């Protein structure tokens, strides 16, 4: 596995052979409803922005005009700017002894008969976001913590436990406009996952960090908690579970807690490869959700209006560029991008 890819020129993806992880659908934008026309064009080309990684995750656009993303097995955060990918941070996830004991095993989604197939422990960081001051927030996954990167580069651990019990693997993370940080904790940061003897919190949970205090918002209600996103008005929190392939919507109370969770849209009937993982929302409230067949675009009313199918199964995504109209898609070994009509939020 290469932990530092050779930067490649951006190329448009046309008809190509898909990986085993890709959808049965062809690469492109697929319309299910005319509402898609005002969101993204079916003629929008999907481009390769960078490639040669192990398992990319957590894309986030920074105010400095560049994209950051993680390569989990490489334990690296990369910076993508002007078509070039470079190392931004080493040891972004687990950064201690006995590294071989950490990180659940995964692979790069090639078929096992393919000579490019690789298995590896997921020792690096996972989700990334920015706080209201523009500082990088990291769900360190195998590092079992939420970390903030200060302006001088110092790492500040904001949270690594709940009531004295260590997290198992913070997965994805978002920031509310009041500065509070919402994140999911999973078993994926540990080698044996839920059966690992180092598990201290025997459930997947949704937490909120605010001014140094960690509050448990949800546990056991939804298995395999993973991706999350707020609606533009922050009245709702959307939440999915990895492998569960459905999304719930929760009302956000004035105090920041959540209530009245309901099924918002269900992807379980679709048998194409792909799972619910990363999620983003645009300024009109449309939800972009990874799932079977690619990235599902769902209206604020819960209607599936179209799917973006990149060459590889998408894991997470982010809006970027100056106008926030480029959707960056993190897959196993590459970062793809496509232009959309509505800016991200």
Enumerate the language-model features and the residues they cover.
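Intrinsic low-complexity/disordered segments
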Residues: 1-2, 22
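Bacterial N-terminal signal peptides that target proteins for export
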Residues: 2-11
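Bacterial N-terminal signal peptides
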Residues: 10-21
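Sequence-structural signature of mature extracellular/luminal beta-sheet repeat domains
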Residues: 25-345
């Amino acid at each position: 596995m290469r932990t530092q890819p050779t930067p490649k020129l951006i190329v448009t993806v046309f008809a190509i052979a898909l990986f085993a992880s890709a959808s049965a659908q062809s690469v492109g934008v697929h319309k299910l409803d005319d509402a898609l026309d005002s969101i993204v064009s079916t003629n929008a080309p999907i481009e390769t922005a960078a490639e040669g990684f192990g398992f990319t995750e957590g894309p986030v656009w920074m105010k400095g005009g560049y994209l950051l993303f993680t390569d989990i097995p490489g334990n690296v955060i990369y910076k993508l700017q002007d078509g070039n990918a470079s190392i931004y941070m080493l040891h972004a996830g687990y950064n201690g002894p006995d590294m071989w004991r950490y990180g659940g095993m995964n692979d790069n989604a090639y078929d096992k008969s393919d000579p490019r197939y690789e298995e590896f422990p997921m020792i690096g960081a996972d989700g990334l976001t920015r706080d209201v001051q523009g500082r990088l927030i990291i769900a360190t996954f195998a590092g079992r913590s939420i970390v903030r990167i200060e302006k001088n580069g110092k790492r500040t651990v904001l949270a690594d436990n709940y009531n004295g019990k260590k997290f198992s693997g913070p997965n994805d993370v978002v920031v509310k406009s009041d500065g509070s940080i919402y994140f999911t904790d999973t078993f994926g940061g540990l080698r044996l996952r839920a059966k690992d003897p180092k598990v201290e919190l025997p459930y997947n949970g949704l937490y909120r960090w605010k001014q140094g205090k960690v509050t448990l918002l949800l546990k056991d209600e939804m298995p395999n908690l993973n991706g999350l996103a707020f609606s533009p008005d922050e009245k709702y929190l959307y939440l999915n579970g990895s492998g569960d392939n459905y999304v719930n919507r929760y009302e956000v109370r004035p105090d920041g807690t959540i209530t009245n969770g309901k099924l918002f849209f269900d992807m379980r009937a679709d048998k194409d490869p792909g799972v619910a993982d990363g999620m983003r929302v645009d300024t009109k409230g449309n939800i972009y959700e990874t799932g079977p067949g690619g990235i599902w675009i769902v209206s604020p009313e819960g209607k599936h209006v179209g799917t973006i199918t990149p060459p590889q199964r998408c894991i997470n995504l982010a809006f970027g560029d100056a106008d926030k109209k480029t959707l960056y898609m993190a897959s196993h070994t590459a970062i793809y991008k496509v232009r959309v009509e509505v800016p991200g939020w």
